[in-house]
């Protein structure tokens, strides 16, 4: 009887181990070096993004999950419901800086990672179809060289680790422009997608008060928005908007533009007009160690 009980107990413990991660066996993400190695894993991506499109179309044998925002993705990963999720490499930097229990697979687009064009993985400013702001903003963006773009990204990644603490250094991207009109540029973003955009409680490191909330917005997108507004000589307002409502808000004229880590995919280009890309990145997979 004792042997039977011991056997039953051992089986029960094994089943508990197998189901401790959301009712499934945890996949060893350290064995992944390219997309084909993901077969058998449960991987997630944000709904309505190229991340999800690529994950669905370019992987086989993968259980795919989708979540509405990156906060939910992080919760799902830490709870063991998923093995990993797709993100831009700068997002991985920021997330891991605040969550040392996480790591990422450094996939390279069109090499060992996702097949993607610059339009797929680049991010651009979106305006209403036919907006005269597109060529003006393209001129502004052309003044930001690649070195400055990367230096700014490295700074905002560090800022995102302690957003309400002053970085103690000048930002890589600044403008000498001043407001020369009473025009206000209304820009929408999630304010929850570090290091591109996030919310914080103070105006540290050049954060901007969120027009429709009590917090402040900061991040790469916010600094780009500030630079554009300053170079155009207009006022700036930042609005916190759910991802799924960004494009419809611009189409309705509620906001002038979107600066939210948004890629100019073909589907979106049919709905809004995009500027040239202001940042390009590899798509990687964040996982729990």
Give the role of each language-model region.
Residues 37, 42-47, 51, 57-58, ...:
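Extracytoplasmic small-molecule ligand-binding "clamshell" domains
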Residues 16-20:
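C-terminal motif of bacterial Sec signal peptides marking the signal peptidase cleavage site
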Residues 26-35, 156-185:
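Bacterial Sec-exported substrate-binding components of ABC uptake systems
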Residues 11-15:
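Alpha-helical transmembrane segments
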Residues 23-38, 94-120, 127, 226, ...:
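Acidic, polar ligand-binding/catalytic clefts
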Residues 25-30, 39-41, 48, 53-124:
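Ordered, small/hydrophobic-rich secondary-structure cores
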Residues 1-8:
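Positively charged n-region of N-terminal signal peptides that target proteins for export
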Residues 22-23, 47-52, 116-166, 222-231, ...:
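Extended ligand-binding regions for polar small-molecule ligands
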């Amino acid at each position: 009887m004792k042997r039977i009980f011991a056997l039953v107990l051992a089986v029960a413990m094994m089943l508990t181990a197998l189901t401790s991660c959301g009712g499934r066996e945890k996949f060893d993400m350290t064995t992944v070096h390219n997309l084909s190695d993901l077969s058998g894993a449960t991987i997630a991506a944000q709904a309505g993004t190229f991340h999800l499109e690529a994950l669905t179309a370019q992987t086989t044998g993968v259980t795919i999950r989708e979540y509405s925002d990156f906060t939910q993705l992080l919760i799902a990963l830490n709870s063991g419901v998923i093995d990993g999720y797709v993100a831009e490499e700068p997002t991985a930097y920021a997330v891991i800086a605040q969550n040392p229990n996480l790591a990422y697979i450094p996939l390279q687009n069109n090499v060992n990672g996702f097949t993607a064009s610059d339009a797929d993985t680049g991010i651009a400013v979106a305006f209403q179809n036919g907006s005269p702001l597109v060529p003006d903003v393209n001129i502004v963006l052309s003044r930001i060289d690649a070195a400055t773009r990367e230096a700014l990204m490295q700074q905002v990644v560090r800022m995102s680790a302690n957003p309400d603490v002053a970085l103690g250094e000048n930002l890589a991207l600044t403008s000498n422009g001043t407001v020369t009109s009473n025009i206000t540029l209304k820009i929408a973003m999630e304010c929850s997608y570090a290091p591109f955009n996030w919310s914080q409680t103070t105006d540290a490191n050049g954060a901007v008060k969120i027009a429709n909330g009590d917090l402040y917005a900061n991040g790469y997108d916010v600094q780009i928005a500030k630079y554009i507004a300053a170079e155009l000589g207009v006022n700036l307002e930042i609005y916190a908007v759910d991802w799924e409502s960004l494009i419809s808000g611009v189409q309705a004229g509620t906001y002038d533009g979107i600066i939210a880590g948004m890629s100019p995919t073909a589907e979106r280009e049919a709905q809004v007009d995009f500027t040239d890309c202001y940042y390009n990145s590899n798509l990687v997979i964040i996982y729990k160690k």
